[in-house]
Amino acid sequence: MSDRAQQGDRVSREGMPPVVILCGGRGTRLREHTQAIPKPLVEIGGMPIVWHVIQLYAVQGFERFLLATGYKGESIVRFAAETPWPENVDVRCVDTGLDTPTGGRIKLLGPRLAGEPFCATYADGVASIDLSKLLAFHTGHSRLATMTVVRPELQFGVTELDPADGRVLGFREKPRSEHWINGGFFCFEPGVLDYLEHDSVLERDPLERLARGGELRAHRHEDFWECMDTYKDAVALNDLWESGEAPWRLW
């Protein structure tokens, strides 16, 4: 593993919890960009999406960030070292392996978290989320893990039908899903690391085991949320930014 410019084996306990940002994936569904650069460096409004994620946390009082890198990680290290961060914001990169799954990446960061609670999220998702409310919800329920859940917009509009005769009653343009999905923006107690192995996919066995044991709670986020999975998503997020009405821009 390799830290970026500011050295130190541990992130000490000062104020808000540290934030782990998962930056290691290959981003294959966004290959128009990711053949040349890692997905976290795909730009929105001229700045990498991971910069937007860090800003979202930093403007709400978080200061310590660990970027778990993998694919083309050297580019992320260079970005972190060369970016002028807000005062008191400390951004470090840790090489967690080329193809290490999400849970394994967090497991590898365990020694650097100094046995304290921490937040975690993905490098490709932005939201108009109040992180102080998320943190208060997490500390209030006294369980090991909190996962933010969202109801994304459906890809297509829907047609409303009369079930009796098939008569079309109306149309709705891209309504929100009726189902809640994982939106990232996690809060974890250090005990979560005991649920992780180096080959763990966070979203599968670890979260499922936490749920079965009653140790996972969901924080519902009803407002804007979007992840950048495809080229179309990247275009949509850039359009929002250029409109001056990007809902995640809280700074």
Language model regions located:
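Conserved N-terminal catalytic core of the sugar/cofactor nucleotidyltransferase
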Residues: 2-22, 29, 43, 47-122, ...
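Short alpha-helical oligomerization interface
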Residues: 35-40
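Residue-level signal for inorganic ion chemistry
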Residues: 50, 76, 109, 124, ...
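Conserved beta-strand termini and adjacent loop/short-helix elements that scaffold enzyme active sites
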Residues: 70, 94-96, 148, 219-221, ...
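Short beta-strand-to-loop element that shapes/binds the nucleotide-sugar donor at the catalytic cleft/hinge
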Residues: 71, 146-163
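Catalytic-core segments of class I nucleotidyltransferases/pyrophosphorylases
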Residues: 117-119, 126, 132-139, 151-154, ...
